Amino acid sequence: MSKRPYCIGEGLKKGAWTTEEDKKLISYIHDHGEGGWRDIPEKAGLKRCGKSCRLRWTNYLKPDIKRGEFSYEEEQIIIMLHASRGNKWSVIARHLPKRTDNEVKNYWNTHLKKRLIDDGIDPVTHKPLASSNPNPVEPMKFDFQKKSNQDEHSSQSSSTTPASLPLSSNLNSVKSKISSGETQIESGHVSCKKRFGRSSSTSRLLNKVAARASSIGNILSTSIEGTLRSPASSSGLPDSFSQSYEYMIDNKEDLGTSIDLNIPEYDFPQFLEQLINDDDENENIVGPEQDLLMSDFPSTFVDEDDILGDITSWSTYLLDHPNFMYESDQDSDEKNFL
């Protein structure tokens, strides 16, 4: 069984409500309360539809209805609920106390909808409009020709300064300076390395010869002293020889100068000159960057048995020789540099 429609019969009034109609409706609802909207028009003596009476009471005549401007918070609630629920005004009005759905709908259509369009937002989808920026800012174009002309004018006005030189000439000058500096550094490095290789090899050879001569002298003096001391313990020697030997031991400071070892004197200066000449020849053969070792020389140059002729004269000659060089701090710095 279907419901009875709100409006039946003929001669129903439509349009704006009058003051008399409003008073009749208010008086009946105060006496009988809300509800039964299909029967209210007949009972209240109104020639109106039941739906029209309900809407008139709910939206206008109800005493607790909130009138006036919508606050900022109410506007934000309407916008957010409309984005999620759409045009369901009764649902939106439930979240706004004392606000009717009709009032919310009217306020949306007259205020909020136009405001969103002005802000570039679609009132239906609540997304930015495609043509939200009718006058887009064109990208700034850079005029390279104008910029080059300005640079040329500024370079001509400051022709007396070094900055007015062409860029290519500045680059060429910088490259030439860098290349010349690299050439000087490389040449200095090679010459320093060559000089260090020559001087260090000669000094090592001379120092090795001096150290060898000194060690042989120490060994020989020790062996002579041991030979002279060994007969002192034997009992088969005559007393006269032992007494003379004890006297020699007591005066051993004169022993080194009084004993003739019968070792032929070796011509060390001639040996050293020959050694230096051979060093120069070997350096020219192997190149400036290779060091010469004692093993590179023939073993026939030095006789270890005859090299101990006069140790004192050898040391003096080594110290006085112009090509004899000690390994100084400068040589060690050059090693670190290499």
From Swiss-Prot:
GO terms for molecular function: DNA-binding transcription factor activity; transcription cis-regulatory region binding. Residues 140-154 have a biased composition (Basic and acidic residues). It is found in: Nucleus. The keyword Nucleus applies. GO terms for cellular component: nucleus. It comes from the Eukaryota. Keywords: DNA-binding, Nucleus, Repeat, Transcription, Transcription regulation. Gene3D superfamilies: Homeodomain-like. Residues 37-61, 89-112 bind DNA. One of its GO terms (biological process) is response to water deprivation. Residues 155-171 have a biased composition (Low complexity). Induction: Slightly induced by auxin (IAA) and jasmonic acid (JA). Accumulates upon mechanical stimuli (e.g. wounding) in inflorescence. Down-regulated by sulfur-deficient stress. This is Transcription factor MYB76. The gene is MYB76.
